[in-house]
Amino acid sequence: MKFRSILAIFGDFRPKSLGIALFGAILFSLFIYLHHFGITSPLLYSLLALLALAFYLKLPRESGFAFGFWVGIAWFYWMALSFRYYELTYLIPFILLGIGGVYGVLFSMALYLKNPLVRALLLWLLSHVQPFGFDWMVPEVMLVPSLLDSSKLSFGLILLSLSLFWLLPQRWLKPLPLLLLPFTLYSKPFSPSLPPFEVEIIETHIPQEIRWEREARARIIEENLKRIDAAILEGKALILFPETAFPLLLNKEDWVLEHLAQKSQEIAIITGALRAEEGEIYNSTYFFHQGRIEVADKIVLVPFGEKIPLPDFLVKPLNRLFFGGAQDYRASASKPVDFELHGVKLRNAICYEATSAILYEGSPQFMVVGSNNAWFYPSIEPALQRLLLGYYAREHRTTILHAANRSPSGIIAP
């Protein structure tokens, strides 16, 4: 088989087709970058989303693979950046090709049939396709910063109206399906639900390359204790720290545990740290209140970051080859954990898992999230994370209290 014939399987790679694919991918991804740079214009995001979806529905089939390739890289290039900290920088180009290739195949299948209604249905279902368990490809997230509702129902109505716009042959009929769009406007709660007590949400800026060094670790612990003392003086009821804010196996450091338990007599403390038990490592959240300690382990691990999502017989050789024999983290087999403070339940989530539907079982009123985004600094990952958190906050009417390292912390309301 000739090389050109092999390429033809993946579509048309002539400049015109590639240009159309690249333009479509830019439209499909631009909202993330605008959000990253702090652009807040719901009308702009609304128009951009409608234009991106309309363009997608009419994209030439031959441009499908290239479109998906560029979308995959535009959305998820930052995944490769974490390999810098494993001395695997040489793998970054191959990881980017892999990311682009996976989404190139997915979108080439979604765009194989030219009927806009079929394409709309497949895009509507795309968030349920999770390569290796990675579930951040949620197309409707582009509606979160807009005037439009990001629910599945509204997203479906938007896709239906745009599909019918393209399908109706008479020009005078084309505006009629667009009359569905006003029914997809987002109705924001008049008064967002906030915890009935004062919360200090910590934002840190600690580079990943130093956070585990002995000298830096001592300084980080000292700074965290000072932040707790300051929050106590300000009369706060709760202080929320990011993921692994205490960079150690916290359950093995009795003096730190005792210190935090003592301070929790005056203020509740939620912080991220690792936990070791029976030779296994867990990414955990520690809750200190009135001298008591509760621990909740992460239940949804990051594919290829905390766990290699492959059969066990492949995991150990890959860990030896690329990660010096380091073992995967272990996930708790339990369901999501709720901490309780002053009669208020706070659903716990750690970074990546806060963007997984399983953590929103029962639509909790409040969620506390700790993230360490230093792995991907600098990149658009925090912007995409905030959009996804906003998507789930809207979907479940959940108020999210988010403490982060190397990205903005804050409250994300529905």
UniProtKB/Swiss-Prot annotation:
Residues 202-414 form the CN hydrolase domain. Keywords: Acyltransferase, Cell inner membrane, Cell membrane, Membrane, Transferase, Transmembrane, Transmembrane helix. The chain crosses the membrane at residues 19-39, 40-60, 63-83, 91-111, 121-141, 153-173. It is found in: Cell inner membrane. One of its GO terms (molecular function) is N-acyltransferase activity. One of its GO terms (biological process) is lipoprotein biosynthetic process. Signal peptide: none annotated. It is a multi-pass membrane protein. Pathway: Protein modification; lipoprotein biosynthesis (N-acyl transfer). Its EC number is 2.3.1.269. GO terms for cellular component: plasma membrane. The active site is at residues 243, 298, 351. Catalyzes the phospholipid dependent N-acylation of the N-terminal cysteine of apolipoprotein, the last step in lipoprotein maturation. PANTHER family: APOLIPOPROTEIN N-ACYLTRANSFERASE. NCBIfam families: lnt (TIGR00546), PRK12291.1 (NF008934). Belongs to the CN hydrolase family. Apolipoprotein N-acyltransferase subfamily. This is Apolipoprotein N-acyltransferase. It comes from Wolinella succinogenes (strain ATCC 29543 / DSM 1740 / CCUG 13145 / JCM 31913 / LMG 7466 / NCTC 11488 / FDC 602W). The gene is lnt.
